[in-house]
Curated annotation (Swiss-Prot):
This is 3-hydroxy-3-methylglutaryl-coenzyme A reductase. One of its GO terms (cellular component) is endoplasmic reticulum membrane. Pathway: Metabolic intermediate biosynthesis; (R)-mevalonate biosynthesis; (R)-mevalonate from acetyl-CoA: step 3/3. It comes from Aspergillus terreus (strain NIH 2624 / FGSC A1156). It is found in: Endoplasmic reticulum membrane. The lineage of its organism: Eukaryota, Fungi, Dikarya, Ascomycota, Pezizomycotina.
Length: 1048
């Protein structure tokens, strides 16, 4: 069933808007690479256009120091303030920027306070020149500068009191100031006049200095408010990443939202500057956080949620049978990713557009009401930015979602993310009604405009003079009582004593640039950027860029189509032909998109209502310790049992393995090493974990495929068999096969079973050595043996106690129980019998003071090479022999009988004795034992004692007689790894699977004989290779890469 989409009424505004959005989104998503490329190129071109406009102005020689025209005093007066002092103001300074002329037509005593801002740490060498020359020529007088009057700590300030009528001449005189170095000088940077262009470096430099100046003279509360606004904006960005992470994207979707917003701002700025609307950089700096907080990122999140919800619903519909009368192709067509995004636009497109229209309308109203104000200009820019952002949301960002879903479909066909329809979307994870969202945004935008209209904060909305024509920062109105306090104090004292009414104009600090021999440093810095632009504008640069563009377009377009070709065949393979139903587990395999809060998932788990928990939620519960990693199988088995869906026990166990892999990959303490486990090449699917659970392995994360070969056939006791061998060592199976061939030529191998009894040796402690000796005598007595055997044999119908071997060490007593175990290897069986026998010994033997230290005291001796096993045997004691004709030795084994006999004596017997070997009188019996053990599901660790072997060879009548004696072969055909399907199949290959129908233990004994025969074949072939000198060549051919050839 297709997802239900609430369609607008035909002919209405909503219907027409939705229809238009569908067409736009469909076209963009069907050509994703083209859409992304066009958007990026448009934004980049606009950015370069704005950037290049400011740069080329400087490149054409319009920098202030490049002009030859006289200085314009009025340009330096921009941002100045005039204060008056006289009887009218009760001899207090009063700001009065209006021109004032005395009755006789002469101006009152009018001074100008000029501060020279010189870059550099020392200006002492220039002070004599300035103070002497200027005072004689112009009557200018140097006064003490006000502390912190320079905007930068590495600048120095000089303050002069100049008659206002001589200000023009003063500025001409101080245009160039010599430095302490002969070749260096400071050159005055005159401010731009209205309509004149500026350079990028000058714009950035002046903006930075002005920013420092404003920060230094701003109120603390203003700085705190701005800091809090930027902190809140950053929190909004962090919240965007958090929500997108909950939706299944850790980085790219949130980054794409920010990139789309940046593109919208650049394009909006380009349109604003094209319309000759000045951009107040200070107000832009202050207003962007409020714009981000007001608009937020809810609309991209809303569209993302809708797309993922529709995708999940269609994914569920794909797995359901096609209804009667419906076309399967139509069902598949509805799941094309562009159609998925169109269905999402049908759901949420109108509401997103309506929200955009409300915000743009509010900003447009602000631009209309304040056309000549900085607030109006900012509203103009913000309105265009939002309009372009809306266009990019349904083109650029929709294309990003399309590519994201395509990639997800490639990685996991049919699993593009799940959405829980029972949990509606909200603002950053909180449930909020859509009407509340609209009213809240409207009120926020209205409050934002109202706050700017009332100009509540003097720092935010301070009038800063006339605007620069190209939208750079306007000059700042100085604060005379902060920047010229010392100069005003000196003038105040003089005026008060003489009694003259005085006017003082405080100019903004004059900025200087340090030059060396007429060479300006800033010009050098700009030349690098100039070279880049010139290189890009050259024919070769344009050709390279165009070629890279074409190649990128073709390759990316091909990759997108290849992704679609890759996804659809897999989807068609999973479809059910002829309308038949498909059984799908209710627990989805894809990660949850609309995730629930942790408290809700924990409550579902505790209340046994966890059937709706998704894989991601279960992984998070594991990482938080709410589900133990080892109990995932039990948890999911319980969930499956209580689920209404037909989830089998095997499905639950397989899901447990998948979740454990993800949990291990995301464990913080090991993530740097294990993060790739979930997607690694370690397989986990298509395995019967029901057989593994509770029997073979815990904390399962998959299974290891091991190469399996067969040696033979080999005639063993008159029956021909292929011997399965699982190994990663080359030559081993080939060598054993050669040994089988040689043995078959002599009539095959003959085996003998010399003993069958598994052992367990507990350790007992007594109060004294005397009591331990008494216990030993009791155990070795007929009564003790009878009591222990009766208790032991009662625990199993196969376990029958054979012998008891006792050893004492001080107060410790060791009893070695030896017993038959049927077709099982018998470790668990004998442990249970020993436990019951010891209880009978304490109760009936009169040893209540006996204490069982451990059930296994290493007197067994299990999984360790020991003389007691070599001499007394453990498990099955087997001998295998064969006679190989001399001709076969020469033809097949490529050696002779005497050479083999001598090698065996010198290597396997004398050599092992020289090494002090214990049970290691063989060439490589362990190789064959381990390979057969792995293939047939035996305990690999018991290869230690099972491979104890002595190989003997003798020349009898010119033929070779070979035998292997293995006193402690520990094998079984039931229990342990033999229950696994693959290992059981190999036991079937040998005809020994499970328990023998009529003779308990016959299958296990038969398997021991086969292992001994395999060892016999391996020993024969390897010793022959050593005698003939072929071992190294064989390994280089079968187990090594080819050696490097040497040039002649």
């Amino acid at each position: 069933m297709d997802p239900v989409v609430k369609k607008p009424s035909p002919g209405g505004v909503q219907h027409r808007v939705t229809k238009g959005l569908r067409a736009i989104v469909g076209h963009a998503c069907r050509h994703p690479i083209h859409t992304l490329l066009v958007t990026a190129l448009t934004a980049a071109t606009t950015h370069l256009h704005v950037l290049e406009g400011t740069y080329q102005a400087a490149h054409r020689g319009l920098a202030p120091w490049a002009k030859e025209t006289p200085l314009n005093v009025q340009s330096f007066l921009c941002g100045s303030r005039t204060v008056t002092l006289g009887e009218a103001s009760a001899w207090r300074w009063q700001i009065d920027d209006r021109p004032k002329v005395s009755e006789d037509g002469q101006s009152d005593f009018h001074w100008a306070l000029v501060t020279l801002d010189l870059p550099g740490a020392s200006v002492d060498a220039s002070i004599p020149f300035l103070s002497n020359t200027l005072s004689e020529f112009l009557g200018a007088e140097q006064i003490t500068p006000t502390p912190d009057s320079s905007p930068s700590p590495d600048h120095s300030a000089l303050t002069f009191r100049v008659p206002y009528s001589q200000l023009d001449g003063f500025l001409q005189a101080v245009e160039i100031i010599p430095s302490e170095k002969e070749d260096d000088s400071w050159r005055l940077r005159s401010p731009r006049e209205e309509g004149s262009p500026t350079s990028l470096g000058h714009w950035v430099g002046s903006s930075w200095l002005s920013f420092l100046h404003r920060v230094k003279h701003a109120e603390t509360v203003d700085l705190v408010i701005i800091g809090l606004s930027y902190l809140a904006m950053n929190m909004t960005v962090v919240s965007l990443f958090r929500v997108m992470r909950q939706l299944g994207s850790r980085f790219w979707l949130a980054t794409s939202v920010l990139l789309s917003g940046a593109f919208a701002f650049v394009l909006g700025l380009g349109i604003t500057t094209t319309c000759d609307v000045p951009v107040d950089m200070l107000l832009l700096f202050e207003g962007i956080p409020y714009l981000v907080l007001t608009v937020g990122f809810e609309k991209p999140i809303q569209l993302t949620r809708a797309v993922l919800c529709v995708s999940e619903e269609l994914r569920g519909g794909w797995q359901r049978p096609v209804p009667n009368g419906a076309s399967s192709d139509d069902s598949r067509q509805s799941q094309l990713i562009p159609n998925i995004i169109q269905l999402a636009v049908d759901r949420e497109g109108w509401y997103i557009v309506r929200s955009y229209l409300l915000e743009i309308g509010a900003l447009a109203l602000g631009a209309v009401l304040r056309p000549n104000d900085s607030l109006g200009h900012f509203c103009f820019l913000a309105a265009w930015t939002l309009l372009i952002d809306a266009i990019l949301l349904f083109t650029f960002y929709a294309t990003i979602l399309c590519v994201k879903l395509e990639i997800t479909r490639i990685r996991s066909p049919g699993g593009l993310g799940q959405v829980n329809a029972k949990h509606p979307s909200g603002i950053f994870g909180h449930k909020v009604k859509s009407t509340n969202i609209t009213w809240w945004k409207l009120l926020t935008v209205g409050g934002f405009v109202l706050c700017h209209f009332l100009q509540l904060s003097p720092f935010f909305y301070r009038v800063m003079g006339e605007y620069m024509a190209n939208g750079t920062l306007p000059p700042t109105a100085v604060s005379p009582f902060k920047e010229a306090a010392n100069g005003l104090n000196e003038i105040y004292l003089t005026a008060r004593v003489e009694g003259f009414e005085t006017r003082v104009t405080v100019l903004p600090p004059l900025q200087y640039a340090l030059e060396s021999a007429g060479f300006n440093i800033s010009a050098t810095k700009r030349s690098t950027f100039d070279g880049v632009l010139d290189g890009l504008e050259s024919p070769l640069g344009r050709l390279c860029l165009m070629g890279a563009l074409v190649v990128s377009l073709v390759l990316n377009n091909h990759l997108i189509h290849a992704a679609r070709w890759h996804a659809w065949p897999q989807a068609r393979e999973s479809a059910v032909p002829d309308g038949s139903s498909l059984s799908v587990p209710c627990s989805a395999t894809a990660p949850e998109v609309c995730t629930r809060p942790p408290e809700e998932t924990e409550a579902l788990l505790k209340s046994n209502q966890a059937e709706s928990l998704t894989d991601d939620e279960l992984v998070e519960l594991c990482l938080r310790g709410k589900i133990a990693g080892y109990s995932l199988e039990k948890t999911l088995e319980r969930i499956a049992a209580g689920s209404s869906c037909s989830v089998t026990r095997l499905d639950a166990f397989t899901r447990a393995v998948r979740i454990r892999r993800a949990a291990v990959s995301k464990t913080p303490s090991t993530q740097n090493l294990c993060s790739g486990l979930a997607e690694s090449l370690l397989p986990y699917r298509d395995y019967n974990y029901e057989l593994v659970h509770g029997a073979c392995c815990e904390n399962v994360v998959g299974y290891l495929p091991l190469p399996l070969g067969v040696a033979g056939p080999m005639v063993i006791d008159g029956q021909a068999l292929f011997i399965p061998m699982a190994t990663t060592e080359g030559v081993l199976v080939a060598s054993a096969s050669r040994g089988c061939k040689a043995i078959n030529a002599g009539g095959g191998a003959t085996t003998m079973l010399k003993g069958d009894g598994m052992t367990r040796g507990p350790c007992l402690r007594f109060p004294s050595a005397q009591r331990a000796a008494e216990a030993q005598r009791w155990v070795e007595s007929p009564l003790g043996h009878e009591v222990l055997a009766a208790a032991f044999n009662a625990t199993s119908r196969f376990a029958r106690l054979q012998t008891l071997t006792v050893a004492q060490a001080g107060i410790y007593l060791y009893i070695r129980f030896r017993t038959t175990t049927g077709d099982a290897m018998g470790m668990n069986m004998i442990s249970k019998g020993v436990e019951k026998a010891l209880e009978a010994m304490a109760a009936e033997g009169g040893f209540p003071d006996m204490h069982t230290v451990t059930l296994s005291g290493n007197f067994c001796s299990d999984k360790k090479s020991a003389a007691i096993n070599w001499i007394g045997g453990r498990g099955k004691s087997v001998i295998a022999e064969a006679t190989i004709p001399a001709e076969t030795v020469r033809q097949v084994l490529k050696t002779d009988v005497d050479a083999l006999v001598e090698l065996n004596t010198a290597k396997n017997l004398v050599g092992s004795a020289m090494a002090g070997s214990l049970g290691g009188f063989n060439a490589h019996a362990s190789n064959l034992v381990q390979a057969v053990f792995l293939a047939t599901g035996q305990d690999p660790a018991q290869n230690v004692e099972s491979s104890s072997c002595i190989t003997t060879m003798k020349n009898i009548d010119g033929n070779l007689h070979i035998a292997v004696s293995m006193p402690s072969m520990e094998v079984g055909t039931i229990g342990g790894g033999t229950i696994l399907e693959a290992q059981g199949a190999m036991l079937d290959l040998l005809g020994v699977r499970g328990a023998h129908a009529t003779e308990p233990g016959a299958n296990a004994r038969r398997l021991a004989r086969i292992v001994a025969a395999a060892v016999l074949a391996g020993e024969l072939s390897t010793c022959a290779a050593l005698a003939a000198g072929h071992l190294v060549n064989a390994h280089m051919q079968h187990n090594r890469s080819a050696g490097a050839t040497v040039k002649k």
